[in-house]
Amino acid sequence: MEPNPSDPVLTDRIQAIVTTEKSIDEMMKCAREIIQDLGKEKQIGKNKMEDNANNFKKLITQVENELSAQMQYLSHVCVGSSHQGSTFGVLQNSLLAQSGLSSLHSELFQIVRYLDPTSDEPQTTEEDEEDGSDDLNEDGADGAPSSTVTSSTTDGSGGGDDAASSSAPRSQEESGRQMTDDDDDMEQ
């Protein structure tokens, strides 16, 4: 399997596994030499046996540490916690924040309409208009504005929450208010 050259983290992890595999091979060779030396009638010097034993201990510690690190990484990936290369949590937090922002815009618009029923259009600042132009670029990939943005800006009821709430509830509220205004005119 050829590693993806565009992902250096993955390449490093695969290289670490290959190095660990080579360490396991060397460890097996050391163990084989120790067992062969012990099986001989005439044993080799004590220094050679100690060198092989120390080399084996060093290699087994390296392999254990590397395999533990790899297993810990895989356990993080499996349970979905944050790990190298994961953007799921960040994306989820961003979407949650956008949802909360649109909900706040909608509630604020309703409060403004409740407090000042004569004002059909909320007061927009230069900053809100700039935010709305950013929403246009995000909503339409080809640069064309979405239908909710177009309808809200043409009838004058849009304002700073272009994509924050649908146009259906606004039109129902406006039609309800117009009916009460018409009823008042008829009574007079």
UniProtKB/Swiss-Prot annotation:
Residues 46-72 form a coiled coil. Residues 171-180 have a biased composition (Basic and acidic residues). Residues 116-188 are annotated as: Disordered. Its main location: nucleus. Transmembrane segments: none annotated. It is found in: Nucleus. Residues 123-141 have a biased composition (Acidic residues). Residues 146-155 have a biased composition (Low complexity). Keywords: Activator, Coiled coil, Developmental protein, Nucleus, Transcription, Transcription regulation. GO terms for cellular component: mediator complex. InterPro entries: Mediator_Med11. One of its GO terms (molecular function) is transcription coregulator activity. It holds the Pfam family Med11. One of its GO terms (biological process) is regulation of transcription by RNA polymerase II. The keyword Transcription regulation applies. The keyword Coiled coil applies. Belongs to the Mediator complex subunit 11 family. PANTHER family: MEDIATOR OF RNA POLYMERASE II TRANSCRIPTION SUBUNIT 11. Component of the Mediator complex, a coactivator involved in the regulated transcription of nearly all RNA polymerase II-dependent genes. Mediator functions as a bridge to convey information from gene-specific regulatory proteins to the basal RNA polymerase II transcription machinery. Mediator is recruited to promoters by direct interactions with regulatory proteins and serves as a scaffold for the assembly of a functional pre-initiation complex with RNA polymerase II and the general transcription factors. Component of the Mediator complex. This is Mediator of RNA polymerase II transcription subunit 11. It comes from Caenorhabditis elegans.
